[in-house]
Regions:
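Short, basic interhelical loop/turn and adjoining N-cap
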Residues: 49-61
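Short alpha-helical "recognition helix" segments of helix-turn-helix
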Residues: 45
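Active-site-proximal, Lys/Arg-enriched surface segment
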Residues: 59-119
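Single, function-defining residue in the core of a domain
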Residues: 1-40, 51, 76-78, 87-91, ...
Length: 305
C-alpha cells in the first residue's frame, strides 16, 4: 500500500516540483512515512520506510534530505492547494504563530493558512530564528509571497489575533487592498467619526454577555505614539466568560465577528501537528530552513487529518 501511495504522490508532484528523481522520491517517501507513522520523529520514520534498507541507512537518507535539498516553496504552495482541493478562492486566511523549545533553542513558526471545514490548511510559513512575536516586516513578507502566488483577490479576509496589530502592518494591508479582521486590545485608544477619543474598553463597557455592537462609521486606532491605523470599522461582543472581544476590520463589520470565530481552525491545525497529532515538538530539527521543509511535508498531508 505504501508503495502505491508513494508512486501516486510522485506522479502528482513531478510536474510541479523541480527535483531530481531521487530527491523527489525521498520527498514522497518522507510524506508517506509521516502519514503512516503519525510522527515526525526522524528515528521513528527511518524504521517505517518500505523496502529492505537498514534503519541506519534510511535515517541518513532523511538527514541528507533536510541538509541538502532545496525546496521551491512557491511550487509547494500550489501543490498543497491542488492536493487539498481548495480551488481558486477567495479564501479566509488565518495568520498565527506557534513555538516550542528544544533544549535551550527556541523554535518559532509564523504560519499563514487557509480556513477550511474545521481545520486550517498551511500554505506558507516562516521559521523565525528567534523567540517572541513576529515583526511587521516578517508578516508583510509572508503576505507578499502569498499575493505573488495567488493574488490579493484570492483573499476573502485575513484573520489574526491581538498579537498581529500595528500601524505599519495595518497600513500595509490597507495599501494592498487585503481585507482584514484583527482582534484588538481593550486598552487601545480610538478616534471615532464624530471626533471623540476614548479607549476601546470604555466604548463597549455596557455590552452585555452575548450582546453585539457594530460601528459602521470609520474610526482610527491610536496604536503607537507615532501613528494611527488606517480607517477601520469596529465590531464587538461580550463572551460568556465576560471577556470583551473587539475586532477592527476594513470589511463589513456584521460579518467580521462570524469570520473571526473561525480563527480556532488554525489552533486545530497546530494541535494536529504538535502534541495531539504528529508530535512536531519531537523532531530534533532546529535550523529554520529544515523546520520549513518539515512543515512542507505536513502541509502536503493536511487532507488526511
Amino acid at each position: 500500500m505504501t508503495t502505491t501511495l508513494i508512486n501516486a504522490l510522485r506522479d502528482s508532484l513531478a510536474s510541479e516540483m523541480a527535483l531530481r528523481k531521487s530527491r523527489l522520491e525521498s520527498l514522497c517517501v518522507l510524506i508517506v512515512g509521516v502519514l503512516v507513522s503519525r510522527t515526525v520523529n526522524l528515528s521513528h520514520l527511518a524504521g517505517g520506510f518500505p523496502g529492505t534498507a537498514e534503519i541506519a541507512s534510511n535515517y541518513r537518507r532523511l538527514q541528507r534530505f533536510f541538509e541538502q535539498v532545496r525546496l521551491d516553496y512557491t511550487a509547494l504552495a500550489r501543490v498543497i492547494v491542488q492536493l487539498t482541493g481548495l480551488g481558486q478562492g477567495p479564501w479566509l486566511l488565518a495568520l498565527d504563530r506557534t513555538n516550542w523549545k528544544l533544549g535551550r533553542r527556541d523554535v518559532n513558526i509564523l504560519m499563514l493558512a487557509v480556513l477550511r471545514d474545521g481545520i486550517a490548511v498551511p500554505i506558507l510559513w516562516t521559521a523565525m530564528d528567534r523567540a517572541g512575536n513576529s515583526t511587521s516586516d516578517q508578516r508583510s513578507a509572508l503576505l507578499s509571497r502569498f499575493c505573488a502566488i495567488f493574488g490579493a483577490a484570492s483573499i476573502a479576509g485575513l484573520i489574526a489575533d491581538r498579537e498581529f496589530v500595528g500601524t505599519a502592518w495595518m497600513t500595509y494591508l490597507a495599501k494592498h487592498d487585503i481585507p482584514f479582521i484583527l482582534r484588538i486590545k481593550k486598552d487601545f485608544h480610538v478616534r471615532l467619526a464624530d471626533g471623540r477619543h476614548c479607549k476601546i474598553g470604555s466604548l463597549f463597557q455596557k455590552l452585555a454577555k452575548g450582546g453585539r455592537r457594530y460601528l459602521r462609521d470609520d474610526a482610527t486606532l491610536g496604536l503607537t505614539a507615532k501613528g494611527q491605523s488606517p480607517a477601520v470599522k469596529l465590531a464587538a461582543t461580550r463572551l460568556a466568560s465576560g471577556e470583551l472581544l473587539v475586532v477592527a476590520t476594513n470589511t463589513e463589520p456584521r460579518t467580521a465577528l462570524a469570520h473571526y470565530k473561525r480563527r480556532w481552525e488554525i489552533e486545530t491545525l497546530f494541535a494536529a501537528v504538535k502534541s495531539r497529532g504528529f508530535n512536531l515538538e519531537d523532531t530534533h530539527l532546529v535550523h529554520p530552513e529544515r523546520i520549513a521543509k518539515l512543515l512542507a511535508v505536513l502541509g502536503a498531508i493536511t487532507e488526511s487529518w
